[in-house]
Amino acid sequence: MSLSRSEEMHRLTENVYKTIMEQFNPSLRNFIAMGKNYEKALAGVTFAAKGYFDALVKMGELASESQGSKELGDVLFQMAEVHRQIQNQLEEMLKSFHNELLTQLEQKVELDSRYLSAALKKYQAEQRSKGDALDKCQAELKKLRKKSQGSKNPQKYSDKELQYIDAISNKQGELENYVSDGYKTALTEERRRFCFLVEKQCAVAKNSAAYHSKGKELLAQKLPVWQQACADPNKIPDRAVQLMQQIASSNGSILPSTLSASKSNLVISDPIPGAKPLPVPPELAPFVGRMSAQENVPVMNGVAGPDSEDYNPWADRKAAQPKSLSPPQSQSKLSDSYSNTLPVRKSVTPKNSYATTENKTLPRSSSMAAGLERNGRMRVKAIFSHAAGDNSTLLSFKEGDLITLLVPEARDGWHYGESEKTKMRGWFPFSYTRVLDSDGSDRLHMSLQQGKSSSTGNLLDKDDLAVPPPDYGTSSRAFPTQTAGTFKQRPYSVAVPAFSQGLDDYGARSVSSADVEVARF
């Protein structure tokens, strides 16, 4: 390698170092800044998405209150839950983007500036030292040749001249090798930086692929069920038809004005275990009064008529149905796919004897103003201890702990609530607790599951049974109403992660007061 080639390679080496320091690092800083803007924008999208699907949950609550659209309410709940899981995957991708890319690049670029500056100075100093040694040998050889030309005996300088030539050749070889190695080192440093960037970007891409794959998997699984649920908008569920027939059999005819009022103001919902009956609008009070006067129609917690089992959410259909009704639409698919963390819903046929017994035990009341949860959510007191174990969706508590119920009704004997002591949320067996009255005293809770057992039926026959106030017997089951701003507490809130179900890493946790306020709206 000639000296000119060595100098050219030296300039290339310096250019590589300067390119890294003057172009790569500033560009990397700009990339990090743009990445932070991107992260901030995605965080804003995530927050907006939570609000959007929170509103979707609210629409699902509204639909689930209706006898005609209850299945669609379950579908809306499933949609919100699926998209909540997708949003959780997006948040995981954002965490990876922040921790594995932006943070590490930001640390590297600060350390890299000082490291490259020191590496370039070291290379330049070593190259200059070797170049100076070569120049010195060449200068000595030049002087020696001048002496040899002016000497009468030039042969005596020949041996020394050969020594200088060998020294120059060795030093020039060392310089060329050093410059070559320096150029290789500079290219390696440049490549390492680009490889680091690509490696971190691949980690982000991997999480992005998992995010999209999770979304595709969930949506592909649920979408056909959702589409089937809304395939026939004109089909009225059997329970709504039976309700109309019950009204007709109780009064001789179906009142158009009553049905019209129920469409706009009246919401027909499933019974809430242990809760007071909902208030009835003034325009329906005379109508309900006439129904109360009929002694031949048994009442069970506000459900009038012989077909009261048809409105029980734990029973699919009564064995003897009018033949004119269309075949009952199975709801087991929607119930089973509602959440993979809920206990499996079973179909149990209630006994009419219990309904009659409870009707006799709990007399009706003329007061229709005893609304559900007038002073807030229902509270229960633990009468037994319960351990969740490894299941993060269950709630642990000890005897005597107070629990605030966060959903309106129990599902197969399981309720969802928040421990006032530990501030943890989760599902728990409702039979382990007693419902607290508004004054804070506890009373015996009688769930639908207990109402179906013979042991509880025998308990009702005892004289020393504490009977609730007369308002509990109000026959408002067929005519409950709620204002437009009143909804059931959502079982799957997108805005409150403590309600989440289905992700292993999203279990019960301590909830801040701000989360509680959001959940309460």
Swiss-Prot record:
Span of domain IMD: 1-250
Chief subcellular location: cytoplasm
Coiled coil: 132-153
Keywords linked to the UniProt accession: Cell projection, Coiled coil, Cytoplasm, Cytoskeleton, Membrane, Phosphoprotein, SH3 domain
Cellular compartments annotated: Cytoplasm; Membrane; Cell projection, Filopodium; Cell projection, Ruffle
Region annotated Disordered, chain positions: 299-370, 445-480
Bilayer topology term: Peripheral membrane protein
Sites bearing Phosphoserine, chain numbering: S262, S324, S326, S337, S347, S367, S385, S396, S455
Subunit architecture: Homodimer. Interacts with CDC42 and RAC1 that have been activated by GTP binding. Interacts with ATN1, ADGRB1, DIAPH1, EPS8, SHANK1, SHANK2, SHANK3, TIAM1, WASF1 and WASF2. Interacts with ENAH after recruitment of CDC42.
Protein name: BAR/IMD domain-containing adapter protein 2
Organism: Cricetulus griseus (Chinese hamster)
Gene responsible for this protein: BAIAP2
